[in-house]
Amino acid sequence: MPKMKTVRGAAKRFKVGKNKIKRGSAFRSHILTKMSQTRKRDLRGPQFVDKTNVAAVKKMLCK
């Protein structure tokens, strides 16, 4: 049986730590002038994949 290949798009979007999978925030690319400083600051912090999606992301990353 051939080796499983990592989904390259997923590899660029997720980082795997000890127990959690880190992801980037949405709503941070453009047209940020309408958004308050507080909202932008909160979106800057680390985000983690929800537990319902962890298995699917791990499968894409071959973990």
From Swiss-Prot:
Pfam families: Ribosomal_L35p (PF01632). GO terms for biological process: translation. GO terms for molecular function: structural constituent of ribosome. GO terms for cellular component: cytosolic large ribosomal subunit. PANTHER family: 54S RIBOSOMAL PROTEIN BL35M, LARGE RIBOSOMAL SUBUNIT PROTEIN BL35M. HAMAP family: Ribosomal_bL35. Belongs to the bacterial ribosomal protein bL35 family. This is Large ribosomal subunit protein bL35. It comes from Campylobacter hominis (strain ATCC BAA-381 / DSM 21671 / CCUG 45161 / LMG 19568 / NCTC 13146 / CH001A). The gene is rpmI.
